[in-house]
Amino acid sequence: MALWIFCPRVRIQGAELMAARGPLLIVANHPDSFLDAIILGAYYPRKLHFLARGDVFRKPIYGFLLRSIGMIPIHRAREGREHLHLNEGTFQESVEVLRRGDGLLIFIEGICLLTHEIQPFKKGATRILEAAHTAGIQPLVHVVGMGYSDFRAFGKVVNISIEVFSAKAVFDHARHRLDFNESVRVQMLRLVDVPAEGVSLRKGLFYLLNLPYFRLLSSFVWRRTAGTVFYDSVLFGALMFTYPIYLVAFAAALHGIFEVPMLITMLALPIGFRLTSIRVVTK
């Protein structure tokens, strides 16, 4: 339900490819931080493991939580070269994911800048594929382009385009890594499709009933994520974990005053907001 409200329209071109079985490497662009992984993980009908920036794993509690949802740390030079040697373990763990026949998602740009402009590719995807081929594993490769109607506003239209990698991945020479990245770039540039629509909020009853909670939460998240690219993903996570608490508290208050059954209130508040307050409109 969280994505149904936060992203009221998600279009998927090539959705039939999501049913692929066996080892799968998903190579995607990275326009909107952790929200990209959340959306792809929600719509692929299989467990996905994700490669995520290694610095967020350094606090033990964060590392435990991120690993519990299938994330694997990958370390970048900008986070400290002393951590780069840990990537050997990352690539080995990624190969084991593929060996089990699971899905692995990597954002090949290695950085998120809240833009649909494709950034220079890193070597992570080629390193994983090369190691997999050496181990006798030939994963299917999906190239994914993601486009958002907005990076900051509540409510998004999301376009996802998926294709099978159109060239043969061979890594007999260092030059082949560059060839792979260039082939993916050409394919990805064609797949990124920024929606022509946006989301408008209609100020009705259900909007007003949710407004105090959302204003308070979004202001708090905005302050905590100022100067970063994490506003969307942190807001979504905060909504997912705290909105049920708000629903219970609101339903309990309404039940105490008017004896309205709590279950009815807890269902009516989010569904009514989604159906009456959120509109997809042409920009």
What residues fall within each predicted segment?
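Soluble catalytic domains of membrane acyltransferases
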Residues: 4-166, 204, 218-230, 236-282
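Acidic, His- and aromatic-enriched active-site or binding-groove loops in soluble protein domains
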Residues: 164-175
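Long, charge-rich alpha-helical interaction segments
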Residues: 174-182, 186-197
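Transmembrane alpha-helical segments and their cytosolic interface motifs
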Residues: 200-209
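Membrane-water interface of transmembrane alpha-helices
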Residues: 210-219
